[in-house]
């Protein structure tokens, strides 16, 4: 089991699908925003990042994965920009000390690093005017409006168009179906509330997923857990299900043989 950010279902910086045969989606459970902060400058296009020192996070991180895709599509290459592995609190400090010019983070609004960035003087939040075009090219992204004053009395100071992606709960295809149902049941309890970019009841969902849906996921989201798993503790529910699946067929065969054997014996006599 793992939580996976939108976009990891695509190869490298392209929008070509990965081999998705071994991973299944149980549900999307949250929305994370793509925050692009700049120091002492306002930008509305990714092309304006050329020549800047840009923090996008370490290798393998969700922030770096999204940043490289967006930079490639904006035709900003490695020779046009200085990329940094800094992220989180380290990126906040580097931006404050003029060691970076811009930072991209993929995180929920409640993130400590995001809150710190928003509170720094001279730090601007990018307002991407071509966000609709970006989402057309990247199915795992959505364009959302962050209205003025949403985060604080005057934060942001104006309406901002942002990119967002979903965080998904995924599992290996070989994981036992009962464990998949259990994980999804927990997600349904924990992730049903609302947030900045979504309303209560929007999650868990199966919209805009990167990997195929687990068969148990759709059934559980629509119908809930099987009756036995709702009534009994998980371990006992599995015992009862095994009894039903194994003992009941054997019992039926035994009863059939008990009726058949006497007739066969009489026929032999």
Predicted features and spans:
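Pocket-lining segment of extracytoplasmic ligand-binding domains
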Residues: 78-164, 175
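Extracytoplasmic/secreted proteins, especially bacterial periplasmic and envelope-associated proteins
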Residues: 21, 62-69, 90, 94, ...
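Secondary-structure end/capping motifs
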Residues: 145-212
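N-terminal hydrophobic or amphipathic helices and topogenic motifs
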Residues: 18-23, 27-31, 191-269
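Solvent-exposed, acidic/flexible segments
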Residues: 26-30, 47, 56-64, 84-88, ...
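Sec/Tat-exported extracytoplasmic proteins
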Residues: 3-6, 10, 40, 50-53, ...
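Bilobed "Venus flytrap"/periplasmic-binding protein-like clamshell domains
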Residues: 32-97
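Short, glycine-/small- and polar/acidic-enriched structural segments
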Residues: 1-51, 58
